[in-house]
Regions:
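Thiol/disulfide oxidoreductase modules built on the thioredoxin-like
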Residues: 124-166
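Generic structural signal for well-ordered beta-strand positions
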Residues: 50-51, 150
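Structural microenvironment flanking redox-active thiols in thiol-disulfide oxidoreductases
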Residues: 74-111, 124-130
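Short acidic-hydrophobic, aromatic-tinged amphipathic segments that line or gate anion-handling sites
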Residues: 43, 116-121, 153
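Active-site acidic short loop of glycosyltransferases
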Residues: 57-58, 89, 134-137
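Oxidative protein folding and maturation machinery
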Residues: 1-50
Length: 167
């Protein structure tokens, strides 16, 4: 019963998002700034809202969807850290969305990370899963400085190759 209610809630969120997109499509083009991604605004560690558009504006950005409460999280975060250390001096930004429902686990795992970490408390019922067509986590997207999604990466080697060309 709860699963059905949550599924209905997710579908309704997706319908609302689709209506918002339709409204944006009807705006005069001079009032619209082109971006090739769905904007995300979620709370960070301090509770303040952080928007993907604020982080990515004019910068190459790695958009990461993940969960900290998994057996693979440590290795994954190590790979993100390696990319950040190598490419942030050249302008790379990282915006990481966690689908953890347990805020304690999430906060303890990201507290020392220097990039932008936000948490979607809806977990696997997040509307972002549908908007970004995420079938499993982790999921990586690379956004160029113009705001276009360059790739949905399947490996960190792919990301490194693209970052070498974009930065």
């Amino acid at each position: 019963y709860n699963l059905a209610l949550r599924s209905i809630a997710v579908v309704r969120q997706q319908e609302r998002a689709a209506k918002e997109i339709a409204q944006v499509d009807s705006l005069p083009s001079k009032d619209v700034r082109h971006i090739g991604y769905f904007d995300i605004t979620l709370p960070g560690l301090d509770g303040q809202e952080i928007s993907l558009s604020d982080v990515a504006n004019g910068h190459v950005t790695l958009l990461s969807f993940t969960s900290m409460d998994t057996d693979w999280s440590t290795a994954y975060q190590s790979q993100i850290a390696s990319l950040y250390e190598t490419y942030s001096p050249r302008g790379l930004r990282v915006y990481q969305v966690s689908f953890d429902t347990d805020s304690y686990v999430w906060k303890n795992r990201v507290v020392n990370q220097p990039w932008h970490n936000v948490r979607d408390k809806d977990g696997v019922y997040s509307s972002l899963i549908g908007l970004y067509n995420i079938s499993s986590v982790p999921a990586l997207f690379l956004i160029n400085g113009d705001g276009d999604i360059v790739t949905r990466a399947t490996s960190f080697d792919e990301v490194r190759g693209l970052l070498g060309r974009l930065l």
